[in-house]
Amino acid sequence: MVKEYDYIVIGGGSGGIASANRAAMHGAKVILFEGKEVGGTCVNVGCVPKKVMWYGAQVAETLHRYAGEYGFDVTINKFDFATLKANRQAYIDRIHGSYERGFDSNGVERVYEYARFVDPHTVEVAGERYTAPHILIATGGHALYPNIPGSEYGITSDGFFELDEVPKRTAVIGAGYIAVEVAGVLNALGSDTHLFVRKDRPLRTFDKDIVDVLVDEMAKSGPTLHTHANATEVVKNADDSLTISFDNGETITVDCLIWAIGRTANTSGFGLEKTGVKLTEKGTIYSDEFENTSVPGIYALGDVTGKLDLTPVAVKAGRQLSERLFNNKADAKLDYTDVATVVFSHPVIGSVGLTEEKAIAKYGVENIKVYKSSFTPMYTALGDNRQPSTMKLVTLGDDEKIIGLHGIGYGVDEMIQGFSVAIKMGATKADFDNTVAIHPTGSEEFVTMR
């Protein structure tokens, strides 16, 4: 007997959860399948535990670098990593509970087993078959290991969250969000941390002026940055340390190696070949602007599509899809332009819109005007442990429409959301100029640039 539903969701990560709940709220009969813990990468081994670790690193920086400058005589007896890890997991468990209550409230059925396609409209789970006219694939992605000898001795970002103590010496290899964030956290928590990147700098998709500030701060406070370094071999030593060799002749011996070289879509192991769904050249599932795959009635969103691997993107795309399918909003879709993002580095980076480099490439240098301001945030300005901050606006044309806003520094992570609304609405430099600043704050720099 085949069980019939209106909507089948394969994958209980951020996108799948959001779409399932929204569909059920509109009266659809929904069932969700997830073979691991609900919440996907973000909640379990991604942005949520990462942010907890970043907060821990911020506390460490406050105690060691800034407390004395504010007159506090602080003696640190010890740092109990086990306490941080246990409290982090307890927080994640509470999120799991919140998800379950949401499912119950909205009437979303769920089976915590892996689903496998039998045909384009039927899946099989634990011997039972389920069918629906609409099936969403939201299976996410997973971290990659390089194809070099000894790569198995390293761990990925998933393994980072399994650590029981802060390694004495750590090598993080990669140049994206995850690499920069993990390296920054471990450095702040006391590990002798080295970040290796293949090219001239990390975060190459971000504005160069902003990244240059981060690189300068790394040179001053860590982690140690190594550029133009491609790992070629990893050897495990008798004392369990690891020696890593690079193609530039460099070697380093560490206690922990973390690979953060990228992620790839989860497209195998659930019978996708039975559906006829097409993949892109990168191995992700092709989906159009409405999240339709190449097969009618099958949809895909989130990391499995490789569009923008950000949790809020998957959540918004999932909700918009359900609005279209189950609430008669035929044009509902996610606008993938001007999506704000933050890197929880030290100091933090925020960005929305085009970088200066991309703006010039798209519109021509003669049509672009850039405004920039650099300063020391007040919080770090009382003593010698000063952190830099740089804010930047990229404008287009005579009316100076703001097409890019970028910043690095204390509090930027909480500033960027509000400014992204203004940019989404088409704000100009004049609009910013006509806004009265809040003083003293870092955000006032964005509305007082000349």
Regions found by a protein language model. Name each.
Residues 2-13, 166-173:
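Beta1/beta-strand and adjacent pyrophosphate-binding region of the FAD-binding site
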Residues 2-5, 21-28, 33-166, 199-203, ...:
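Glycine-rich flavin
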Residues 8-18, 22-36, 41, 48, ...:
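Flexible, glycine-rich terminal cap/loop adjacent to redox cofactors
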Residues 8-10, 115, 130-140, 172-173, ...:
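Short hydrophobic core segments
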Residues 47, 137-192, 224-225, 273-275, ...:
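Glycine-rich dinucleotide-binding loop and its adjacent helix/turn
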Residues 112, 116-124, 189-289, 329, ...:
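A Rossmann-like FAD-binding core segment of flavoenzymes
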Residues 151-167, 251-328:
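FAD-site-proximal beta/loop scaffold in flavoenzymes
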Residues 210, 301-360, 431, 439-450:
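A conserved FAD-binding loop/helix module that cradles the flavin
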